[in-house]
Structure formats: structure tokens, C-alpha cells
Regions:
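Basic, amphipathic juxtamembrane/active-site segments
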Residues: 74-114
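Glycine-rich active-site/cofactor-binding loop and its immediate structural neighborhood
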Residues: 55-87
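Hydrophobic alpha-helical transmembrane segments
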Residues: 1-63, 100-201
């Protein structure tokens, strides 16, 4: 089970916004770049001013980013804006945005730098395995349990928690460790999906 499974419901809530954007000549690539810029600026702020209270921004920015990601996909598919450049921007933008938004956790008190770096590596590995499925079988794997939407929810909630209760940062390393395990599990599941689909064919 992963939050990706409720994506169609989320998209239906954004459809009116999508049509408004299309009417005003906003393209899928514009939205992708806006999400990337928002992530980079937020990450830079959190790194330069590593104060727990500022992590209150994280759930807000992550929610906006997820909405923008949904909108760029809808514009691409439903408004005939799918391009090779768009695919490149989408995939690289997702990875860069994840790094930009989650790297600041490294600068929080009580955070072990190696654990945060390991978690970021596992995040990249997970997305690579999802793309590997598309390379081999033509269908990208979004298998869980810790996909992009799930990460946004958990890390957004943690950002909210430590901004309100800074003492909770003593549990930072436990969360990074659990997240790394879940990410590795997700990577394995995505690779297994490749093998199962290949076997069925």
C-alpha cells in the first residue's frame, strides 16, 4: 500500500486548476521547473538558517510540490504536452528536489550526517529502480512501501513535529534509519516488479 494509489483522487481535485493553467498558456515544463525552483530555494533556506522552527515550511512546500507534480503530469497527458525534454526534467527534477528538501535534515541537532547521506542515497536508488523497470518493461514501477508521496508525508510531518517540539530531534537518527530500511525495501520491490513482469511475458 502506498499513497501513490490515491493519486487519481488528488488529480481530480486539481483538474479545474489544470484547465485554468492550460488556458493561460502555462505548460507542463513550466510547472516542473517551478516545483524544482521552489524545492531548491526552500532547501537553501533550511541549510543556511538551520533552525528547527523553519522546518515548519517543509510540510507546506512538500504539499505544494506534490500538487505541482500532479499538475505537470496532467498537463502533459491530457493537454498533449508530453515531450522528451519534459520526461528528463520530470525525473531529474524529482531527484534533485528530494535531495534539496531532505539534505537540510543533516544540519539539525542530533542528526548523524552519515545516516542522512545514506537515506538520500537510498532515495536516489529507489527512483533509479523505478526507472529501471520502465527501461526494461516499458512501465515505470511505483511499488512501495516508501515512494515519493509517502516520503513527502512522513518527512513533512517530521518537519512539523521538530518545529513545534524541538526535543523530538533526539529521535532523528531512528527515523533516518527506519526510512533507509523502507527505501531499500521499496527499491527491492521495484526490482522484483521488473522480474515478475518479465516472467509473465
Amino acid at each position: 500500500m502506498t499513497l501513490y494509489q490515491i493519486k487519481p483522487l488528488f488529480q481530480s481535485l486539481l483538474r479545474a486548476t489544470m484547465f485554468w493553467l492550460y488556458k493561460h498558456h502555462v505548460t507542463a515544463n513550466h510547472i516542473t521547473l517551478a516545483a524544482l525552483a521552489l524545492s531548491l530555494l526552500t532547501g537553501l533556506l533550511l541549510v543556511l538558517v538551520a533552525q528547527p522552527i523553519l522546518f515548519l515550511l517543509l510540510p507546506i512546500v512538500l504539499f505544494i510540490r506534490m500538487a505541482l507534480n500532479a499538475l505537470d503530469g496532467m498537463l502533459a497527458r491530457e493537454c498533449n504536452q508530453q515531450t522528451r525534454l519534459g520526461a528528463i526534467l520530470n525525473e531529474t527534477g524529482d531527484v534533485i528536489s528530494d535531495i534539496a528538501l531532505y539534505l537540510p535534515f543533516l544540519f539539525l541537532p542530533e542528526s548523524n550526517a552519515l545516516l542522512v547521506i545514506l537515506m538520500l542515497f537510498c532515495t536516489i536508488l529507489t527512483e533509479f529502480c523505478g526507472l529501471l523497470a520502465q527501461t526494461i518493461n516499458g512501465i515505470r514501477s511505483y511499488a512501495g512501501p516508501f515512494g515519493k508521496s509517502d516520503r513527502a508525508l512522513i518527512f513533512g510531518l517530521w518537519g512539523l513535529a521538530v518545529s513545534i517540539y524541538p526535543q523530538w530531534m533526539q529521535w532523528n537518527n531512528l527515523l533516518w534509519s527506519i526510512a533507509s530500511i523502507l527505501l531499500l525495501w521499496t527499491a527491492i520491490n521495484r526490482c522484483r516488479s521488473v522480474l515478475f513482469m518479465s516472467a509473465e511475458r
